[in-house]
């Protein structure tokens, strides 16, 4: 125990430097040198938050950081230390209940984490020690240990692959538990250790690994291994993410591997990813905090008023010191200011229940339990991936009903990301794969169907480029889980585009046969096998927007093949070759196809020696490796020869257009942020109806700006011109703007990445902010915006700009790829698509769904219902507590401001915990104030709740005045009834506690029946909790007043409730007061039902007369209480 603690404490020492050195097998390099074991953390995984010793203090500290909990703690301490009118139990017991329930919930969740940690930490692993396999517990693995992992086992820590049972030193891994990707990934051993396949040979290895310090990026690793043999100098090889096996990943289709541990325990990438995303706060939470401040002010005002009036009332000697209650000498000598302060605190305690202590717990339970409805929704289930929706955080359920802006990726989100090779052009000549029917069978018309033929050698060169320049892997069907291509093998790649291009080349006679021992094998049109030595791969990245390979032919020629976006390739090829291809690229983009340009160049041997040295040096760098590689790549990929371009079709997702239309009808602004070229993205936007045929497009692109020599001057002119046009067309208010979308000319904006950079980073003094301001004004007036050629960080920049607009609009981002993660994390709500580009977006999102079409129901139905439910819950909590405390306040005017409580301590304690908590919880989980089909069919209903409509000042005042009216009725109704002696048969008048019990009975029944009136969607659960709560109150009152409790000093409630109900007059009084309290609500229901029926009849007559289809009119929800939609009346 002490050693583990010491290890964890000392583990930070090695973080002082930028890299760490690992001795493979924990062997010294030279037998003559002493070996000192390094201090790294052990392999224990600790995902739990608490221990047995720190649970109580740590949990209490976290809970009392909440304003309401801390407030009630202060009230409790005041009750304990000051002579207050109520027992400390009245505030202490509810607080204890809330704290205990939360602690039990969090403790149970942490216990589950402890149990899961122990299962991992105690699992058996095999370590190579002294040329033998030694069985150990996983937590005992140390950095430098060589670990043996067998098929279908999970890697116990982050390992560098040394060797595998395959001859080429590869292994296949699935990382579903890390990033959700179920497809196999290939990892590679260093070529110098491939042959070390036995425990003896592994134990004889002397090597060191230098690598970066632990960091959470799953897809980044920088290191190098130095292997020492009989020679004096070590052989150094670079290490990258393809050599690293991550903890939590599973070995597949490989019998056995050996790897050396480089990161263990809490320093593994999986453990570093445990940390949660930045906390997002919903609009409802902000409203709750604002309401708490308002009610705290009301509480302070009540206490101040009562304290002041008490001393005004006591200014009369008879009132201050009556003959039957003379003050003691000590009371007379007490400092007056201290007495006033003590009285103020006493009134604070008396009225403290105006702040709902249990609301936070109820809100948490509502969010947690409510999130299951999304996961259980069968409409979100996708048979293709056999998965449904997933909720990664339940804190933002209601935020789904408040979205103003939707930012969506294009590829894989609006489109299927299922690529098909359509056509290509070679040296400006168009080639298209055509088919013809022969005896009912479809077959390709020759290897290449062409419209104008290029040189035969150029055709072959182009197709060879498609077969060589990619990261596709060929696997036999036995090595692959899932669907196969046929013919005994399948293609696997992280990019569907590359698979489509390789398949396209295969269709036209050139077949990629895989990569064996560093040689790429290609079968040409003559069925001959060609082999190319793969010298270097210059991987694709979103900044360069291209990738390259350097290969050596069988004749010894060294060639570079490069493919990428036209904007990336054209500046790097000879200018006279561009025009031949550019027209085809633009035409294909207009047709909605994804285009890539292909280029090559021959590298002289002398140049290659220099290039090779630069690449090796950059790959071996441990610091700034990416920047150094990028610099070398930039130098290599110049002066190329353009061969041609490809066109790949990415079909629109099912119901993508309908979803866009529904979001538009709901008043949401949809922006498409994509890295594709403008023409392709523009075509997709028309196809998915983001742009309508009558939409006037405003362009801020490189093409429109380059018409002038001074780009910034031209940009300024366009911005001013567009702003004038839009301000003249549309009114200023946002609300009228949404109506104007259907009444006036619609405008759409197109902007590309370079123009956005010019707007944000203008060289003119102070013009950048001015450009940004004008640009945002234009965007706000457009119904749709297309941002093309966007880098990932630019996507996040745009989301951040909109978030910071005046009014703080709620933003939602949806995407499927790693390049969408930045905008998903930046927006208020992040949605990940479980797509074909991995699961990085889904893993970093708040919610994940299989398809873009599911966004419609997620927002229009679930978002709408969640918001209405929790908004009603919040308003109801403050309403019922104001109803509860107002009679207590009014009672002080009739008891000389003596701080006499109106209710018994048991009622004060149980009101929020037992009598009124379950009905509102059931309502907030199950209520459907509008039918789900109606919400789906009429997206305009969504507009009625946006802008946090139900928690604005209007609804807040409505609920507050309603509570004030009902609280006044409770008190004065009972007060005036007490003026007569007819309540008892013997003429006796009820006392103080009977008076308070009648008020409390009317209160409990009224606030519960108010919720029953508000309920439209009745289930057996609603019936059970509503009528059950009322029955429990009656039962408890009989039980509490029917027994003499020995632990109570005073038996003031003994037989009060039973005697009270023996009077028929009391029964009638209670029923009458409940009816008077609810009468305005009932009257509102009747009036609005009549108006609704009248509106329906008029609508039916209008439909019959003019035969026009129209959606039902929608009543504003700003002041709704939902009682008008009750099924009771």
UniProtKB/Swiss-Prot annotation:
Mg(2+) binds at residues 409, 411, 816, 820. Its main location: membrane. The record marks 439-440, 445-446, 481-482 as: Cleavage. It catalyses: ATP + H2O + phospholipidSide 1 = ADP + phosphate + phospholipidSide 2; a 1,2-diacyl-sn-glycero-3-phospho-L-serine(out) + ATP + H2O = a 1,2-diacyl-sn-glycero-3-phospho-L-serine(in) + ADP + phosphate + H(+); a 1,2-diacyl-sn-glycero-3-phosphoethanolamine(out) + ATP + H2O = a 1,2-diacyl-sn-glycero-3-phosphoethanolamine(in) + ADP + phosphate + H(+). ATP binds at residues 409-411, 498, 540, 563, 594, 674-676, 789, 795, 819-820. InterPro entries: ATPase_P-typ_cyto_dom_N, ATPase_P-typ_P_site, ATPase_P-typ_TM_dom_sf, ATPase_P-typ_transduc_dom_A_sf, HAD-like_sf, HAD_sf, P-type_ATPase_IV, P-type_ATPase_N. Proteolytically cleaved by CASP3, CASP6 and CASP7. One of its GO terms (biological process) is positive regulation of B cell differentiation. The active site is at 409 (4-aspartylphosphate intermediate). The modification Phosphoserine is found at residues 442, 1105, 1113, 1123. A motif (Di-leucine motif) lies at residues 1113-1118. The chain crosses the membrane at residues 84-104, 288-308, 344-364, 877-897, 906-926, 953-973, 989-1009, 1024-1044, 1067-1087. Widely expressed. Expressed in retina, brain, liver and testes (at protein level). Expressed in lung, bone marrow, lymph nodes, prostate, ovary and uterus. Expressed in fetus. Its cofactor is Mg(2+). Belongs to the cation transport ATPase (P-type) (TC 3.A.3) family. Type IV subfamily. The di-leucine motif is required for sorting to clathrin-coated endosomes upon ca(2+)-dependent PRKCA activation. It is linked to Mice defective in Atp11c show defective B lymphopoiesis, specifically in mature bone marrow, pronounced stomatocytosis associated with anemia, hyperbilirubinemia linked to mild cholestasis and hepatocellular carcinoma. Component of a P4-ATPase flippase complex which consists of a catalytic alpha subunit ATP11C and an accessory beta subunit TMEM30A. This is Phospholipid-transporting ATPase 11C. It comes from Mus musculus.
